[in-house]
């Protein structure tokens, strides 16, 4: 009796599975047929892009927004794909930076839909009823169109001396032997070294907008902390001394726009807080877990 009922249940389950498989095959076939249709037979997906334009060579011309229409069927999924398509097929005068197309180099940083991010990893909103506005990074001088002037930003980065500094470099085998670092000390650099210097965080910070000449900004300060906390670096005290003025660090008011907008998911606000703790004496740099110059003897 039980065996008979079990066979009936298994039979019904088998029939149900078979029907579901047939539906899946049917749906898959329909999708393939739709994809196989020529693009002319498919309904266009026209997306409007409103892009900031300004050419300094045109004397007296003010910045303006120019609208382009892109068929999303013939374009890659990212905003950078659309910009490249516009430049290649519609308007070769459109100017922007780009390089790796993988979120690694930081070249294509811009303000997209009100958020500072990287065009190469920012997906296009497929809602064609809304246009997408694209601006250069805010509160920076503009070279042309979507290209900001990064000179001040890079000069600030240069001023923190972003390289490993040792007190006895002359007596060490520089370039011939590694400086040792424990796993624990190395882990302190996680969330710091990944910064690609795209400036999305700094240009989203109101304090940086108001004090760009004196306040170093989230990106540069996070890199400063990366070298201050590195167990192999022996110049941390001097690095901190350079940050003791009222502006370099203390213009940060923990607004935290920097952390919200970082396309790499980093936390510049936390790094700045750690620098403040070191400057105030609430914390100190711990001694290295390993003798860093052991291989140089």
UniProtKB/Swiss-Prot annotation:
Most abundant in the adult thorax and low in abdominal tissues. Its EC number is 1.3.5.1. The keyword Nuclease does not apply. Its main location: mitochondrion. A ubiquinone binds at residue 210. One of its GO terms (cellular component) is respiratory chain complex II (succinate dehydrogenase). One of its GO terms (biological process) is respiratory electron transport chain. It is an enzyme of class 1 (oxidoreductase). [4Fe-4S] cluster binds at residues 195, 198, 201, 262. Residues 185-215 form the 4Fe-4S ferredoxin-type domain. [3Fe-4S] cluster binds at residues 205, 252, 258. Residues 47-140 form the 2Fe-2S ferredoxin-type domain. InterPro entries: 2Fe-2S_ferredoxin-like_sf (IPR036010), 2Fe-2S_ferredoxin-type (IPR001041), 2Fe2S_fd_BS (IPR006058), 4Fe4S_Fe-S-bd (IPR017896), 4Fe4S_Fe_S_CS (IPR017900), Beta-grasp_dom_sf (IPR012675), Helical_ferredxn (IPR009051), SDH/FRD_Iron-Sulfur (IPR050573). It is a peripheral membrane protein. Its cofactor is [2Fe-2S] cluster; [3Fe-4S] cluster; [4Fe-4S] cluster. Gene3D superfamilies: 3.10.20.30, Alpha-helical ferredoxin. Keywords: 2Fe-2S, 3Fe-4S, 4Fe-4S, Electron transport, Iron, Iron-sulfur, Membrane, Metal-binding, Mitochondrion, Mitochondrion inner membrane, Oxidoreductase, Transit peptide, Transport, Tricarboxylic acid cycle. [2Fe-2S] cluster binds at residues 100, 105, 108, 120. Pfam families: Fer2_3, Fer4_17. One of its GO terms (molecular function) is succinate dehydrogenase (quinone) activity. It comes from the Eukaryota. Pathway: Carbohydrate metabolism; tricarboxylic acid cycle; fumarate from succinate (eukaryal route): step 1/1. Component of complex II composed of four subunits: a flavoprotein (FP), an iron-sulfur protein (IP), and a cytochrome b composed of a large and a small subunit. Iron-sulfur protein (IP) subunit of succinate dehydrogenase (SDH) that is involved in complex II of the mitochondrial electron transport chain and is responsible for transferring electrons from succinate to ubiquinone (coenzyme Q). This is Succinate dehydrogenase [ubiquinone] iron-sulfur subunit, mitochondrial. It comes from Drosophila melanogaster.
């Amino acid at each position: 009796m039980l065996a008979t009922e079990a066979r009936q249940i298994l039979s019904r389950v088998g029939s149900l599975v078979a029907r579901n498989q047939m539906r899946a095959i049917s749906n898959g076939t329909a999708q393939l047929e739709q994809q196989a249709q020529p693009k002319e037979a498919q309904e266009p997906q026209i997306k409007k892009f409103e892009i900031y334009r300004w050419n300094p060579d045109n004397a007296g011309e003010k910045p303006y927004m120019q609208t382009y229409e892109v068929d999303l069927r013939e374009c890659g999924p990212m905003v950078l794909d659309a910009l490249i398509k516009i430049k290649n097929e519609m308007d070769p005068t459109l100017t922007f930076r780009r390089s790796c197309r993988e979120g690694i180099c930081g070249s294509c940083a811009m303000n997209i839909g009100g958020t500072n991010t990287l065009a190469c990893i920012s997906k296009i909103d497929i809602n064609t009823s809304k246009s997408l506005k694209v601006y250069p990074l805010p509160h920076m001088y503009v070279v042309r169109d979507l290209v900001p002037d990064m000179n001040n930003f890079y000069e600030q980065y240069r001023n923190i001396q972003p390289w490993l500094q040792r007190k006895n470099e002359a007596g060490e085998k520089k370039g011939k032997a590694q400086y040792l670092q424990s796993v624990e000390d190395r882990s302190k650099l996680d969330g710091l070294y990944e910064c690609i210097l795209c400036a999305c965080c700094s240009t989203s910070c109101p304090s940086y907008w108001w004090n760009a000449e004196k306040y170093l900004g989230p990106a540069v300060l996070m890199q400063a902390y990366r070298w201050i906390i590195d167990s192999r670096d022996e110049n941390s005290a001097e690095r901190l001394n350079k940050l003791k003025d009222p502006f370099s660090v203390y213009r940060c008011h923990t607004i935290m726009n920097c952390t919200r907008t970082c396309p790499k998911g980093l936390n510049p606000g936390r790094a700045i807080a750690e620098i403040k703790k070191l400057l105030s004496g609430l914390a100190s740099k711990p001694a290295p877990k390993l003798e860093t110059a052991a291989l140089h003897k």
